[in-house]
C-alpha cells in the first residue's frame, strides 16, 4: 500500500505541474486518479485559457521560480491567475500544515518531480519517472509510522484512491522494470 501512496502523490504532483492543458488528452483509465482540485482547475478552462497555459509552459525554463511564472500568468490573464493561485494556495496550505519530517518528505517529492520536467520540445522520460517513483517509495518506507499516518490524514483523498484495486494494478504495472 505504501508504494501506491507514493506513486499517487507523485502522479498528483505531476498532473499539477506537467499534465496536458486538456483533460481529454489523459487516458480514461487514469482520469479517476487525478486529484479533484486539479480536475476543477481544468474543468472550466476556455480555449484562450488553454492557449495561454501552453504558451507559458513552453517558456517554463525562463522562469526563475513558481512566483515568476505566476506573475507572467497574471500579466496575461488575471482570471486564470486567480484560479492558479487558488489551486496553489490549497496545496501549499496542506503542505504547510505538516510537521517537519512529513513536510520535508513532500518538499523532496516536489523537487524531484520538478527535476523530471522535460526540456522544451522533449517528452517526459518514463524511465526517469519510474526511477524517481522507486526512489520516493524507498524514502517513504524509511519514514516512521507517525509521519506516514500524518501524510495519510493530510491527504485523505490519496488514501481513498490508493485502496482502489484498479489503481493498485495500474501502479504495479507502471513500476515494473523493463
UniProtKB/Swiss-Prot annotation:
Post-translational modification remark: N-glycosylated.
Keyword Coiled coil: yes
GO cellular component, one term: extracellular region
Pfam family, one: Gp-FAR-1
GO function term, MF aspect, one: retinol binding
Keywords assigned by UniProt, alphabetized: Coiled coil, Glycoprotein, Lipid-binding, Retinol-binding, Secreted, Signal, Vitamin A
Family in the record: Belongs to the fatty-acid and retinol-binding protein (FARBP) family.
Task of the protein: Binds retinol and different fatty acids.
PANTHER family xrefs: FATTY-ACID AND RETINOL-BINDING PROTEIN 1
Name of this protein: Fatty-acid and retinol-binding protein 1
Organism, as annotated: Onchocerca dukei (Filarial nematode worm)
Record gene name: far-1
